[in-house]
Amino acid sequence: MDTQMQFRKNINSLRALAVISVVLFHFKIRGFEGGFVGVDIFFVISGFLMTGIIVSGLQKQSFSLLGFYASRARRIIPALLTLCTALLIFGFVYFPLDDYRELIRAIKSSLLFSSNFMFAKSGGYFDAPLHENWLLHTWSLSVEWQFYMIYPVLLMALHKMLGLHKARIALVVLALASLAASVYVTNSNPVFAFYMLPTRAWELIVGGLVFLFPLQIGKRTSLMFEGMGLTAILASILCFSEQDLWPGYLALLPVLGAALVIAANTESAFSTNRALQFSGTLSYSVYLGHWPLVVLLYTCGLLGSWPHVTAGIVLSFVLGALSYYFVESRTRKITTPPRAIFKYASLVVGVVGVSAITSSVVKDHPGIRFAYVDLGQPAYVSKLYEQECFANPYDAAECKLGKGEVSVIIFGDSHAQATAAAVQIENPQASLSWARGGCPTLQHFDMHDKELASQCHGFNADKMNRLKTSYHGVPVVLFSRASLYSDSSRGNSYRIYFPGQEHLAGQAFVDTYTAEYTRTVCSIAENHPVYIVKPIPEMPFSIYKGLNLHKRIFQSTSDISISLNAYEQRNRIAVHAIEAAAKQCNATVIDPTPYLCPNGRCIGSKGGVPLYFDDNHLVDSGNEELKGLFKQVIAPI
């Protein structure tokens, strides 16, 4: 076995392919819908290189665990620290208080290499709210760092106890176990599977196995292997999308593709291309720098603008070059492990400490910042009606809106609470609002968040029972952010499944969801007129944040909207279920899009005024746009 780790041009070109695919995916370039596989490619490369360093050192009896950690710190921390410091300053100038403190939390978790845990608690990688997090991309660095902490110790132990040959077999078993876990957990808990080391470790170990099982092949076979690997990678980029559950078994295609390219180890047009070599050299710094630019354009509503996107891509590589030549290259000169570890640990602790102090200071003294004058976040609680709310064991918003006899019942998730004002402004009497955030209007379902599932089951059962025994003949208006629950491919943190059918997906899931939703609606319709409201349009980002940042940076205001076609595509499954239930249960469908989506655009703001509290909950200004929509619900008095 070759124990000499030399610079490999084919690996450098593979790095370039990985970073280019990720950058173009994040900037929403058509044809790169599967560009997120670039991270999987990076994992394979890291596994190969780290295994080479560790095993070569063990074979020579010269491996130093301290030296290994120092080299990883020297490679990763300086550029990351530079990015975090720049964002700390940028946010100080431009961000509202809550956003700035959220950024500081992300900085701390990123520098402590625990951001994958933080983001896993916030939802799926492809969920819109996380696209506003300036350091979301550091989740992969956290996974790699955690691997770096464990892997050399594991290899040292296996090498000592089993010898190299048996250690290789043990790694094969570990890789297969991690892959099996990834396949299983991707279906049952996709958020965990995406972010966590146990379900990602196999990708890194596969890279290690390429080093441990070197191929002895000729030039022609090497070129064939490289071609097969590149074809697999390109197929992944072109054929996969964020609609696919990831990583799971699908990740085998780019992972094995990357493994083939590395194993081929041949000189070709791919490995000698100067542009790819240059991009590969800059890949880490480009990866770090591109995502904040994506978030900036995303939050300002400019990610669909070709001039801005082009500028963002170019600037990603310019900033990457600056970071590489002025940060990465210079910090590699520190070679003494204790000195390196002490230096980087001190820098990390220093920035984390400064971040924590800054967070506390700006909270108590907002006037010290340039951005302390807030443009005014809209109030979540409506001022269009009086309300009396009641305590309940479900952490739900259970309220009586207005005064007099109850003439309407509003039932659903947080969208029921957020849009209740649109119903109540038509109602001269009172409404009952029953709303529990994150709960689908279903009777028989389950969720991976067992605490939330328990509350949803209790809340729904209680309200369904009350509808059977009370308020007979009173209209019931059903609201729901239905696309959150009805599309099993999204893998968000509110994803539901059905008892005994945990792995149901595709059309089978759609059919089961539609049947369960219809059963719920028909049960209510036995005693009440039922009105089902089609989903409220969801914006791509927080309207308030977008308007605020655009105003501060560009000194101008531009209204935010999405296409009606995008709305229809997102809610296709939900609308299908609603229309099927309405037809079978003799319910009435209410469509908000003629009011919120004039001229083929669904508006998030009007005249610089947000219609939403965030990206999906209407506020008073948005509810007033719906005036007249619910007149049909209110019986004449």
Where are these regions (language model features)?
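Membrane-interface helix/loop caps of multi-pass membrane proteins
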Residues: 2-337, 352
